[in-house]
UniProtKB/Swiss-Prot annotation:
Catalytic activity: 2 a quinone + NADH + H(+) = 2 a 1,4-benzosemiquinone + NAD(+); N,N-dimethyl-1,4-phenylenediamine + anthranilate + 2 NAD(+) = 2-(4-dimethylaminophenyl)diazenylbenzoate + 2 NADH + 2 H(+)
UniProt KW keywords: Flavoprotein, FMN, NAD, Oxidoreductase
HAMAP family reported in the protein's UniProt record: Azoreductase_type1
Protein origin, superkingdom: Bacteria
Native organism: Idiomarina loihiensis (strain ATCC BAA-735 / DSM 15497 / L2-TR)
Keyword NAD carried by entry: yes
UniProt-recorded name of the protein: FMN-dependent NADH:quinone oxidoreductase 2
Amino acid sequence: MSTLLHIDSSVRAVSNTNPDHNSISKSIALRFIETWKQHRPQDEYIYRDVGVNPPDFINQDWVGAVFTPDDKRTPEQKERLALSDKLIDEVSAADVIVISSPMYNYGMPAQLKAWFDQIVRINKTFDFDLSRGDFPLQPILSGKTLITVTSSGEFGFEKGGVREGSGHLAPHLRTLSKYLGVDTMYEIVSEYQEFGDDRHRVSVANAKDRAECLASELSLSTTDSLLKSDSVGSDLGITP
């Protein structure tokens, strides 16, 4: 049995009275999840909608608690870190992680960044050793597969695209993924939302098809090297 951790971050719901307000990223991720569950109903499923129920932002007291040795933390400091501990436990338990995110102002939503800030924590998800020279940080967790589902109003943020360098969502997710223990990463992308034309409709349809295909492939391969390889998948493909 595997554990699937699903994180949504759009402030919108999957289904609204006005369908124009439906979350695209959540709907694509849901296609992946539903397909996965069809193939692997026995797996543990953990879900958090950080867009609707955002984690607390870290603050000075949080940082102080993190850098206080475990045996010297006050009850208040332990309570301050309780949510962080819980979120880290969920990531640690996961074999497969699905993160859906819209692009807000060319980056990730603040709520998703808050989730990462609660998780990327010294001596929990990374350690620090200056003997490593200019790269003292090293992830602690490993062996996980990440599927990111992103949606954007514009297009062409990929390498060589017309907006290369202006989209910070996907690069940020790739950088932070190693602190979740990710060895293998797949990206599913939907674009053109602001244009509302055929390009957008085709992009969403293709993303949902990719999500379903990828979920089928991975859910049937949880015991082989497909989930445990050291490579990174393309943004639309299913092969790492």
